[in-house]
From Swiss-Prot:
Its EC number is 2.1.1.177. Homodimer. It holds the Pfam family SPOUT_MTase. S-adenosyl-L-methionine binds at L73, G104, L123, S124, P125, L126, T127, L128. Keywords: Cytoplasm, Methyltransferase, rRNA processing, S-adenosyl-L-methionine, Transferase. It is found in: Cytoplasm. CDD domains: RlmH-like. This is Ribosomal RNA large subunit methyltransferase H. Its main location: cytoplasm. It comes from Pseudomonas savastanoi pv. phaseolicola (strain 1448A / Race 6) (Pseudomonas syringae pv. phaseolicola (strain 1448A / Race 6)).
Length: 155
């Protein structure tokens, strides 16, 4: 099974890349953690933001193969504790499909992406910076795996 983070935005600071890669390499091979970056359209003063969101959503969905699970990260999604995330991770693992965790751009996800979502997850009611979200997702996936495997990291 693969866990794939599909996120709008690229050219992250080095600390973000290092943080993401640190948690990705800690994951066992049977739960590979991957990152797919979707280029962010340049927002100018008179930008057609709705068109940009739609284009970014199309690019995100183009990375998803038929039958794969889509989980959107949304402020109004369901908040999961670490233990609840571990339960979800175990369900995903038993389902054996690739899980695509979708993170939109500054204005959020395209409605088409949300419509395809099987689950909606909220990391926090706070607005979080996109670079930090990547590391947070990586760390939480690793932490959930340690709960399932009895690894002492979570304690």
């Amino acid at each position: 099974m693969r866990l794939r983070l599909i996120a709008v935005g690229s050219r992250m600071p080095k600390w973000v890349e290092e943080g993401w890669h640190e948690y990705a390499k800690r994951m066992p091979s049977e739960l590979a953690l991957e990152l797919v970056e979707i280029p962010l359209n340049t927002r100018g003063k008179n930008a057609d933001v709705a068109r940009f969101i739609r284009q970014e959503g199309e690019a995100m969905l183009a990375k998803v193969q038929p039958g794969e699970r889509i989980v959107t990260l949304e402020v109004h999604g369901k908040p999961w504790s670490t233990e609840q995330l571990a339960v979800e991770l175990d369900r995903w693992r038993l389902d054996a499909r690739t899980v695509n965790l979708m993170v939109g751009g500054p204005e959020g996800l395209a409605p088409e992406v949300c419509a395809r979502s099987e689950q909606r997850w909220s990391l926090s009611p706070l607005t979080l910076p996109h670079p930090l979200v990547r590391i947070l997702i990586g760390e939480q996936m690793y932490r959930a795996w340690t709960v399932l495997s009895g690894h002492p990291y979570h304690k």
